[in-house]
Amino acid sequence: AELGVFKGDTAWKLNALFPQQRLYLFDTFQGFDPRDIKEEKSKGCSFAREGEFSDTSEQAVLGRLPFPGQAVIRRGYFPDTAAGLEQERFCLVSLDADLYAPILSGLIFFYPRLVPGGMILLHDYNNERFRGARQAVEEFEKQYGRLCLVPLCDLHGSAVIVKPCD
């Protein structure tokens, strides 16, 4: 699954690497939601603007995928768009929503549904432009316990969260 699809770069890679797997793609496809911008500003996380990252569409993303029949677009506000997927299990989730509220919602929804050994690739964990990612992880850990998180040395300050095997 991917939360925060934008133009589909990561979706393309996931779809190409795992052609037999269903790929849920969660995005507003209209840029940042005003509710998230309001919370972002109140927490001092970033200077994100409403509509930023809106230069995309479902059709453009699906048109890039090598196996578009395996992709399921869930357009709208997350976590509302996850309704009906409560019984799903996930092996790999790309969490690239940039902002505090959707990242926290993504962790709350996806982490318990990860299979043992499953991973969340968290974009912007160490990114100074979008500090809400780290704040969301800290809030999640306060509520649900410590995560097995490994920071990566990449341009966007990503991290990998691994669900321990039982």
Regions found by a protein language model. Give the residues of each.
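S-adenosylmethionine/decaboxylated-SAM
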Residues: 1-166
